[in-house]
């Protein structure tokens, strides 16, 4: 009996109750764990491939967002003594900068030139959705893209009336100030995390993963029997 579960950023693949596999192997039933191990690890790789591909078709991720989806990695491989493989999202957070935006690159805080900035930025998370304007509300400014010293490009808002101690950019330029002469604090605009995206698409992928695991188990049994027959 196979068991494939996904929750809280972890996908676990196990095989329990291997009576059917043992019966199929007959005198070679001692090789059951080895056969199951190979099938489980192959399924983990296939599950990752399917989940990343499905997420790319659903979400309007940009190049950075596509890389972020691939943070789903195999943290644990199955072994003969532990028939379990685990996929895990290493980076949990996401921001709107990983999705389609218009413009697609920062135009604010690039030196002292602000003239290329749009009157309002637009963005979307789902490919099936239209672009939405990022207008400000509740004491927050309109959204805009900014490139951080780490190289990450994020969608942020200014907290109107706040005061930041970061008065210069990484290149030493003076930052924009409000009427009081203060640099306002930046707040990243959130979006579905890679964990949330994979969790959403998992029900669409699960049947294929379950079927693949059964196929791999059968293929490994046949391979073991074929090798034994050649000896």
What feature does the model see in each segment?
Residues 1-231:
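Short, Lys/Arg-rich flexible segments
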């Amino acid at each position: 009996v196979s068991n494939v579960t996904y929750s809280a950023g972890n996908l676990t693949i196990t095989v329990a109750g291997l009576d059917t596999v043992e019966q199929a192997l007959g005198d070679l039933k001692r090789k059951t764990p080895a056969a199951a191990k190979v099938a489980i690890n192959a399924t983990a790789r296939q599950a990752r491939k399917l989940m990343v591909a499905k997420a790319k078709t659903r979400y309007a991720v940009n190049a950075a967002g596509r890389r972020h989806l691939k943070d789903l990695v195999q943290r644990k491989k199955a072994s003969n003594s532990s028939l379990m493989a685990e996929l895990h999202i290493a980076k949990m957070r996401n921001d709107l900068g990983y999705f389609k935006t218009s413009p697609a690159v920062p135009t604010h805080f690039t030196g002292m030139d602000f003239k290329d900035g749009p009157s309002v930025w637009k963005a979307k998370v789902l490919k099936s959705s239209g672009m939405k304007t990022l207008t400000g509300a509740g004491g927050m400014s309109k959204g805009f893209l900014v490139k951080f010293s780490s190289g990450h490009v994020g969608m942020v808002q200014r907290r109107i009336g706040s005061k930041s101690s970061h008065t210069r950019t990484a290149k030493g330029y003076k930052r924009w100030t409000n009427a009081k002469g203060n640099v306002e604090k930046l707040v990243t605009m959130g979006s579905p995390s890679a964990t949330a995206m994979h969790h959403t698409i998992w029900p669409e992928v699960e049947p294929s993963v379950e079927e693949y695991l059964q196929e791999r188990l059968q293929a490994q049994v046949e391979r073991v029997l074929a090798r034994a027959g050649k000896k």
